[in-house]
C-alpha cells in the first residue's frame, strides 16, 4: 500500500484520536495532543460525511469539554485549523475556542 505523506498524516491523526477516545472512556483526562487529535478527527470525518464548514466550525467546539482535559489545556488551545476533504474539494476549517 503506497500512501502519500498527507494520507499518512491523516491516518496518524485518526489513530491518535482512537487512542485518546479509549483513554477518555477509561476516565483519563486528555492532554494537548490528544485533545487536538479528537477534534481534528471529528472535523475530517464530518467533512467526509458532507457536513458544511460552518457546521463543523460550530460543532467542533462541542466535541470536548473542559472537564475532560488536564488542567490548563483549554487555555492553551485558542483555535484548531484542519484541512479537510469535502465532497466539493479540500477546505480549511478553523474551530475557535474548541474546548469550553
Swiss-Prot record:
Q: At the top level of its lineage, which domain of life is listed?
A: Bacteria
CDD domains linked: Urease_gamma
Q: Name one GO biological process term.
A: urea catabolic process
Q: Where in the cell is it found?
A: Cytoplasm
User: Does the record carry Hydrolase as a key word?
Assistant: yes
User: Its pathway?
Assistant: Nitrogen metabolism; urea degradation; CO(2) and NH(3) from urea (urease route): step 1/1
Looking at its record, which EC class is this enzyme? hydrolase
The protein's UniProt keywords, in alphabetical order, are: Cytoplasm, Hydrolase
Per its record, what are the GO molecular function terms?
A: nickel cation binding; urease activity
SUPFAM superfamilies hit by this protein: Urease, gamma-subunit (SSF54111)
* Catalyzed reactions: urea + 2 H2O + H(+) = hydrogencarbonate + 2 NH4(+)
> Mind naming one GO cellular-component term on file for this protein?
cytoplasm
Q: Where is it mostly found? A: cytoplasm
Write down the InterPro entries for this protein, in alphabetical order: Urease_gamma, Urease_gamma/gamma-beta_su, Urease_gamma_sf, Urease_subunit
Gene3D superfamilies reported for this sequence = Urease, gamma-like subunit
Q: What's the EC number here?
A: 3.5.1.5
Q: Which family does it belong to?
A: Belongs to the urease gamma subunit family.
Summary of subunit composition and partner proteins: Heterotrimer of UreA (gamma), UreB (beta) and UreC (alpha) subunits. Three heterotrimers associate to form the active enzyme.
NCBIfam families assigned to the protein according to its UniProt record, in alphabetical order: PRK13241.1, urease_gam
Q: What is this protein called?
A: Urease subunit gamma
Query: Source species, please?
Result: Rhodobacter capsulatus (Rhodopseudomonas capsulata)
Lineage in the entry? Answer: Bacteria, Pseudomonadati, Pseudomonadota, Alphaproteobacteria, Rhodobacterales
Amino acid at each position: 500500500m503506497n500512501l502519500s505523506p498527507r494520507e499518512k498524516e491523516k491516518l496518524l491523526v485518526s489513530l491518535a484520536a482512537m487512542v485518546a477516545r479509549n483513554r477518555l472512556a477509561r476516565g483519563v483526562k486528555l492532554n494537548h495532543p490528544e485533545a487536538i487529535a479528537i477534534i481534528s478527527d471529528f472535523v475530517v470525518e464530518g467533512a467526509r460525511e458532507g457536513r458544511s464548514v460552518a457546521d463543523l466550525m460550530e460543532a467542533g467546539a462541542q466535541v470536548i469539554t473542559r472537564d475532560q482535559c488536564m488542567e490548563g489545556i483549554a487555555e492553551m488551545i485558542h483555535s484548531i485549523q484542519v484541512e479537510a476533504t469535502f465532497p466539493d474539494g479540500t477546505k480549511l476549517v478553523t474551530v475557535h475556542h474548541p474546548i469550553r
